[in-house]
Each structure stands twice: as structure tokens, then as C-alpha cells.
Amino acid sequence: MFCAALMCARPLLAANGTVAQADALLLHGLAGHDRAEVAALLDPEFTWIAPRGKSQDRAIVLQNFPSPANATEQIQVREYGNAAVVRADRGQMHVLRIWVRRPAGWRALLYQEVLQVAKSETPGPGSRNCENPCRSIPFTPQIENEKAAIASWQGVMQAMATNDADVYARLIADEFTATDTHHARPFSKSDRLAQIQKLKQTGAHSAPPPLVSARMFDFGDTVLMIAREQRPNGKPYFNTRMWVNRDGRWQMLFSFNTRIE
């Protein structure tokens, strides 16, 4: 089911329809090693990120046919205009699939897995001044929507570094979730706000990790970023984020973080 023009900034929950059908066909093709079926559903820019951080492009996926996790789990689909977010969760394993609407139909742009730890880990220290990513990053967005999404993201990073819950709340969508390898469960917007308030009360700070590199994709009402980040002396990881243009500002929809082992 497609998003009506005036409603594209709001998520459309789809129990079935073209996105879910395309998603089911992709899983079917992967299970049967059907190269033609899978190739027809993968975007030229497609990326597959496995739970230990191994990244494969479209050509390699069509050679190796990796097995998707949680393939039989019920999916949650949210459509945002020309993009759709598919989630399949079971226990500590979480799967994200991003679909984009192309002229020929829906195509898969990203498949990513996060296997969360049984007990949450304490992240290593970041740079206290938060130069990267709060003020400058080693990546230059090319178009206006990308620039606006990056500005919003840096606003979130600054809010986290300074424990500013009000700014954080404005720039985060209500349906936001953060799914990280080093945590035992996903966190909601309210969870994150509670964490910020607790840090503020204790006088502690959480410095965001520096950005190493990024790829961005503009879909009109949404922007996707697949970033590589790394704390000093820590392991790198892929962090995928998506923003939606809603209520006159770009809000983050999710953060999906896979550590590179």
C-alpha cells in the first residue's frame, strides 16, 4: 500500500501489500538460490551486513546466497513515501531490511543483522569535546536533504554530549528505536530520554563515537545513512540511520548498529 501524498511524513503500517510481497519473494529466492528472482529484487546499490560486520555488495550476494536470519518470523513494515523499513526480530537477533521504490517497483537496498549481547556492555570513552561528530565530520553531503539530515544528526549528537533532553526529543521520531550490538535489548525514544536525564542528574556525560566514513541515500521524504564509526581503542561498527522530514524538521527514525568483529 502506497503512502498518500499528504501523509508521506507519517509511517504507514502495512501488514501486507507490495513491500511485504517483495520482501517475501526475496526471502523465497534466497532460500532457493534463485539468482534471477533475487537479482530482480536487489537495488544496484544493495549492501548486506552480517552480524559480525562482514559487508557484501550485490554481486557477492548473488554469488554466495547468504542465509537470512529470522526468515520465518512475522515482519513489521513501515512505509515512508519512497522508502520502507522492514524489521524481523527474535530474541537477541534483529534484522533490518530497507526497501526503496524505483520506477520498476520496490527494490531492496540494505539487509543488516544485529546480534545483541546477553548482558549490556559499557561503551568505551569517546572524545569529550565531541569535535567529530558534533561539529565536523570526514564526510561531505552532496544535496540539500542530505545536508539537512546531517545537521539534524549532529544536533542529536550534541544533545547527547551535553545531556540536552529537549533538543534530543525534537529531533527524534516517536517510533524511534536504537538497536546496538553492545546492548542486551533495543531502546526506545523514552528509554533514551530517561538515560539522558539520569546522566544530567549525576553530572556524567556520554560522548558520541567519531564518524569514520559514510554513504547516504536521498528518497525525498527520507534520507538513509550507512556509517562506519569507531571509538578510540574500540572496534569499528556499521551504524545505519534513517531520517524523515516531518513537522518541518528532520527526525531520526532508527539507529541500527552492527559491530565489526
Task: Please report, for each region that a protein language model flagged, where it lies by residue.
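Bacterial N-terminal signal peptides
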Residues: 1-11
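Short, low-complexity N-terminal intrinsically disordered segments enriched in polar/charged residues
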Residues: 9-44, 109, 115-170, 174
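Surface-exposed, charged secondary-structure patches
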Residues: 15-18, 47, 60-96, 193-237
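Hydrophobic pocket/interface hotspot
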Residues: 26, 37-38, 46, 61, ...
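A mature extracytoplasmic/lumenal domain signature
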Residues: 42, 52-53, 89-91, 97, ...
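A short gly/proline-enriched turn/hairpin at secondary-structure junctions
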Residues: 45-56, 60-64, 175-187, 198-202
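Short hydrophobic/aromatic-rich beta-strand segments that constitute the beta-sheet cores
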Residues: 48-49, 86-87, 108-110, 178-179, ...
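Short beta-strand edge/turn micro-motifs at domain boundaries
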Residues: 94-132, 236-261
